[in-house]
């Protein structure tokens, strides 16, 4: 197992979701290239005393469903998803689909209906669970970055496996300054920007 994947799994479970004994964790992933990370997450969650569950997504299958879906169908899909989500304490999503434009030809009324009717599950997940969503490096992402997959993976793992708890502590002074600040003025060559950060 690539040690960078082990480190990323540790970060997602320990820092991002703070998985505890007994936590039910839904791992929701798309793309074959992230299976090693999914497997490592399962191992790590078990080691923490948690219970991993896995959903597998496929944008091509989702596209086919959405092209002819009905409101009744999506409403029921949301009821099932929401019931499952209400049983979870944490959610880890990994997105590594091969085609970022797979849903581009789904009619906007179908997509809007889907997003509107499934929003209760999203709202519950965001407000009631410990969660993290990340993209995972693949050929599609490397191509969008105009780089090789290997170079993109190196960049990705360097950025995604930083010591975020250390960064969090390092930002305490800035956060304290921002709490007592109203107006911010940024001035430089070609820039003169003033704005409020109050509330």
Where are these regions (language model features)?
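Active-site bordering "gate/hinge" segments
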Residues: 1-199
